[in-house]
């Protein structure tokens, strides 16, 4: 899509989403499996304004095996991990259980966007990845390079649901 965005308003929007909706701060390590052609790249890079450290990955998310990104998360002490519903569903289908082999003590939030996150994927994450993590299904748009609905660290996570509308977006 050939869309031009301004920098100032986008950065302010992302700061709101990072600081208030994701509880991102200076000591965090933010990762989102994305290409620089997807709006999530802009969202990821804006994490620098919160003082977070970015973790980048170039390559297949399932090479040399389906748990490659979770090993990265453990080794790099990622605190906020972003991915897609398709990736999580693929892991479940492959029978991957990162929880059994990979320590993820720093991980506190998993974000998922790109399509709706199925209720079964919530079950999979809490059973096979990490039980004490905030799983946020988020929804936004390339045209606004922001989120319409996303997580809230003050609200409970409900299987198959988005937690809340973005502040100022309803």
Please place each PLM-identified region on the residue numbering.
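Short Gly/Pro-enriched turn/cap motifs at secondary-structure boundaries
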Residues: 159-166
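Conserved AMP-binding/adenylation subdomain of ANL enzymes
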Residues: 9-29, 39-79, 94
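Gly/Ser/Thr-rich phosphate-binding loop
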Residues: 49-52, 79-82, 92-159
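Conserved adenylation A10 loop of the ANL superfamily
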Residues: 1-3, 18
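Alpha-helix/helix-capping structural signal
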Residues: 86-89
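Active-site beta-alpha turn of Rossmann-fold NAD(P)-dependent dehydrogenases/reductases
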Residues: 34
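Conserved AMP-binding/adenylate-forming core of the ANL superfamily
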Residues: 4-8
């Amino acid at each position: 899509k050939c869309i031009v965005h301004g920098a100032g308003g986008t950065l302010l929007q992302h700061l709101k989403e990072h600081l208030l909706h994701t509880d991102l701060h200076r000591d965090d390590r933010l990762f989102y499996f994305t290409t620089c052609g997807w709006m999530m790249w802009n969202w990821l890079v804006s994490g620098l304004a919160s003082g977070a450290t970015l973790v980048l990955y170039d390559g297949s998310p399932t090479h040399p095996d389906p748990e490659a990104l979770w090993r990265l998360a453990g080794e790099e002490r990622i605190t906020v991990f972003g991915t897609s519903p398709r990736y999580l569903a693929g892991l479940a289908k492959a029978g991957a259980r990162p929880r059994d082999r990979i320590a993820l003590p720093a991980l506190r939030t998993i974000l998922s966007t790109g399509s709706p996150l199925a209720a079964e994927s919530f079950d999979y994450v809490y059973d096979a990845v990490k039980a004490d993590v905030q799983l946020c299904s988020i929804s936004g748009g390339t045209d606004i390079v922001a989120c319409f609905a996303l997580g809230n660290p003050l609200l409970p996570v409900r299987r198959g649901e988005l937690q809340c509308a973005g502040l100022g977006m309803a």
